[in-house]
Amino acid sequence: MPSLQVIRAAVAELPQGSSIVAAVAGGTTGIGSYLAKALATTFASHGSKLRVYIVGRNAGRAKTVISECQKISPGSDWRFIHATDLALISEVDKSSAEIIKQETEAPFHGELARLDLLYMTHAIPILGHKRTTEEGLDALESTIYYSRIRFILQLLPLLTASPRVAHVISVYAGGMENGVKPDEEPIGFVPAEIYHFNTVRKYTTFMKTFVFEELAEKYAERLSLIHIYPGLVDGPGFTQMPRWFRVLFTLMKPLTSLYMTRSEDCGMVMAYLATSRFSAKGSGQDAPTSTDTLAPKSSLGVVGGGAYSLGQRADSQTPQIMFEKSRKPDTSKKAWDHTIRTLDDIAKKNATIA
């Protein structure tokens, strides 16, 4: 597990390379906003080398985040992309199209239109009431899985245009993929009779592992894909939980605060994921070597595998997530086919409505 000192030192090197264009889905609050401030702080003296698209629902909060970040990093370019509900694939498509439009019409410094970093932190309360979107997806499953894969696929033209290795980061439950039995194959929608936030986590983390590995293979040397568990981070998410949870959390907070991650540290860890330590598959671009004891291992247990599942300090959780007893020759294809079929079906239906 890298220390915060190691993490900060690595992040401090980000401005030394070429300029960075980033997009943060869910960047108006919580972890997304902590990351935004970490990027602004990192580029405090190099503002002209940073452009960030903040995607979210609340324009007021976005204005506050952007104002604070511009003060921290004078000269940096911050843009708000409004999305009413990122559980909807149509809103993901709309947001992605707007990013592509703006980046194509006015590429950063007149350089090639591209996206170097894509962070996805958008979420809904995991203990809230089950809700089905107008597109037919469970809102929780969509927010933490389907909409995130859609973001990646829609923004691939910009991501693969990056002169760097583009980094894609999904913040949810990396390293928490354990609990899958050898005879289980949690691919598809969570059946109603076993629906629970733990079951949703099992299905979505299982599929995400295999789809990220598939993308890492398809876009070797171009994409690094990371699924991370941020730890217990104090923020507005707790106020959106059911009343019983808020009361319990208030009573337990003096104790839980001992285990909480500070917002500044969380933001710095998120920024650390943009460094070359998390390399694409087959990339030799400043990639760590297997002799590096702190080198992150991919979900396949190798250094530089391109698809990573990490704990709250960006530490590899390989033994838990390799699914050695669950991997079959067609597991990856099943996860990929289900995901693409689901997204394509929704896109076709949306096209007939538009």
Swiss-Prot record:
Positions of disulphide bridges: none
- Annotated NADP(+) binding sites: I31, D85, R201, V233
Protein keywords: NADP, Oxidoreductase
Q: Which Gene3D superfamilies match?
A: NAD(P)-binding Rossmann-like Domain
Q: In which pathway does it act?
A: Mycotoxin biosynthesis
Q: What else is known?
A: Trichothecenes are sesquiterpenoid toxins that act by inhibiting protein biosynthesis.
What name has this protein been given in UniProt? Short-chain dehydrogenase/reductase SAT2
Origin organism is Stachybotrys chartarum (strain CBS 109288 / IBT 7711) (Toxic black mold)
Q: Gene behind this chain?
A: SAT2
